[in-house]
């Protein structure tokens, strides 16, 4: 079966287009001179201002870096790095001002199902440059989290970015699905990435792939912009929704590439776009289907 991709982008009317460079710098745990550089357009800046999204580079201030390896992460794809991720999260989330939760590039970090909860003390960048992988065996999945893998809850002023990947290791889940084999019981499977009960969030340039079921869910959240995100799964992977948005308002998807198996690429439920002053958020979503 061919893999279907859906390329989506938003056109904003009457906004200038000019590239600027934003640079992030490190501090906590190490002097990190890493890839905290973001190419943004004035269009994006103006839209962020319109939605009251935070100014990440304000004043060129230093950011404190919480590197998961400083908390014991191995990154061999076999050792359980969950405790290291939790420790780095607790440190980054507790820092006032600007802080960075860093997943370094070049390694695969095995992380079990976990809820990363806020509120955090300051603005937070979640920099994913390596690959986060899920346990691949449904039989050993944490029974306390049957429908989620990486969950982010009750956050505000958070920026997810990086050239890394979130890999749900979903092949055994697909094989056990009743969609694949009608003799199998029909049971739910985890969502790879969930942002829930959060506001003023940006997600940029990440890859989410091989989701156990849904890849990326935004729920009960407000003022979220997702841009440059890639969602990938094999064409025969069952019920692997690409991006699922529910019970949320002011959510924008921009320049996303979605090839999410045989189920829905995008799903929107109970979305609300609000008036701000005498302005109304007006956008045009353009989708292009790509087969490969």
What does each model-identified segment do?
Residues 2-292:
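Extracellular/periplasmic carbohydrate-active domains that bind, remodel
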């Amino acid at each position: 079966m061919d893999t279907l991709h859906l390329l989506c982008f938003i056109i904003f009317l009457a906004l200038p287009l000019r590239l600027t460079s934003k640079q992030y710098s490190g501090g906590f745990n190490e002097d990190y001179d890493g890839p905290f550089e973001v190419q943004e357009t004035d269009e994006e800046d103006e839209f962020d201002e319109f939605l009251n999204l935070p100014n990440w580079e304000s004043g060129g201030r230093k950011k404190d870096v919480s590197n998961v390896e400083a908390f014991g992460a191995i990154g061999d794809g076999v050792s359980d790095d969950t405790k290291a991720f939790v420790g780095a999260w607790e440190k980054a989330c507790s820092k006032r001002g600007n802080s960075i939760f860093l997943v370094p590039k070049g390694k695969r970090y095995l992380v079990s199902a976990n809820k990363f909860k806020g509120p955090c003390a300051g603005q937070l960048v979640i920099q994913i440059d390596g690959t986060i992988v899920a346990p691949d065996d449904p039989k050993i999945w944490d029974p306390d989290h049957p429908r989620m893998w990486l969950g982010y809850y009750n956050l505000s002023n958070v920026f997810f970015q990086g050239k890394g990947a979130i890999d749900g290791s979903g092949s055994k889940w697909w094989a056990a699905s009743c969609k694949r084999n009608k003799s199998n019981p029909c049971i739910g499977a985890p969502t790879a990435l969930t942002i829930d009960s959060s506001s003023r969030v940006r997600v940029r340039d990440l890859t989410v792939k091989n989701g156990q079921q849904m890849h990326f869910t935004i729920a009960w959240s407000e003022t979220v912009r997702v841009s440059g995100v890639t969602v990938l799964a094999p064409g025969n992977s069952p019920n692997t929704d690409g991006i699922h948005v529910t019970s949320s308002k002011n959510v924008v998807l921009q320049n996303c590439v979605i090839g999410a198996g045989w189920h829905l690429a995008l799903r929107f439920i109970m979305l609300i776009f609000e008036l701000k002053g005498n302005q109304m958020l007006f956008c045009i979503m353009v989708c292009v289907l790509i087969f490969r």
